[in-house]
Structures are given as structure tokens and as C-alpha cells.
Amino acid sequence: MNRLAALLVFGLIAACSSSPSAADKDAPARAAPATLPIVIRSAKGTHRFDVEVARTPQEQEKGLMFRKELAADGGMLFPMNPPRTASFWMKDTLIPLDMLFVHTDGTIAFLQANAQPYSRVPVSAGIPVAAVLELRGGRAAELGIAEGDRLAWGGCAVSQEKIATDLNFCPSPAN
């Protein structure tokens, strides 16, 4: 019985130890969100972004809420499959965002620049879209991105790279 008690005490001490296990050391790497490449072709050039993807309804509901910053070439993609009329607001969003509503042909249907933090006013293109892309507020203007510009993502955006994703968006080139 003493041997069992000693093992239990040792196990409790080990479990409460503050030294990280091998799994804990890897936790920040696992916690880092995977990104998806997006390329936007505009009159002023081609621009690449590496964005997070909000796939689930829960991820889409949270979006970029509570973020204090966003990388210049970062953002978040909200895929709509099947395409639908999407409406977004900025409640609990701390930073301004550019919202790009993307037609099923890959063109930007509507661009809401610098959506105001904490606003409860809905933002929508008013038509079904394939996705909404959120970028750091003002970034679209900095790069000359406008309505009518064309997007692709996943392996279609960077065909020279091997992208392991089921989120390839390959609209037909403009005629």
C-alpha cells in the first residue's frame, strides 16, 4: 500500500509540475491559425494575402472580433458555399476593416472600405456572393484594389506552390 501511495504522490507532483511537456511546447505552433493564399489582380498589379479562413458558422460568427491588429497582408476569408447574401457588422471588432464581397465569377462585387469598429450597422453587397474577404482597414485603397478586380485563392491563386486545401477558388479568367 505504501508503494501505491508513493506512486500516487509522485504522479500528482509530476502532473502539477510547471515544466512544460513536449506536447505543451508545441501548443503555440498548433494554436497558430493555418492560412490560405489569396491573390487579387487589380489595375495597379497583383497582390498576395495569406489569410485565415472562417469555415464553420461559429468561426464566421466570431470573425476578427477582439483582434487588436491585423498584418498588412493578412486577413480573413469567409467562404459562402453555396453562395448567399451575406451581411456583416463590426460589433466587438476593435480595428477598422475593408470588406470585399466576392461574386461567383471572382470579381469584387462590393467593397466596404474602413468599416468602423463597434458599428452595428449591417454591411452587405445585397446579392449572393461566393465569399467575403476582410483586410486591414484602408489596405484596399493603399493597393488600388477596387470593385471589379478579380480574386482567386488556394492552389488557383498560387499554382506554382503545392497547396493542400479543399478551398481552391478558380474563377474563369476575364474575357
Question: What do these predicted regions represent?
Answer:
Residues N2-V9:
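Sec-dependent signal peptide recognition
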Residues V9-F10, I163:
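Residue-level signal for mature regions of secreted extracellular proteins and peptides
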Residues I13-A15:
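C-terminal motif of bacterial Sec signal peptides marking the signal peptidase cleavage site
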Residues S17-N175:
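Compact, glycine-rich, soluble single-domain proteins
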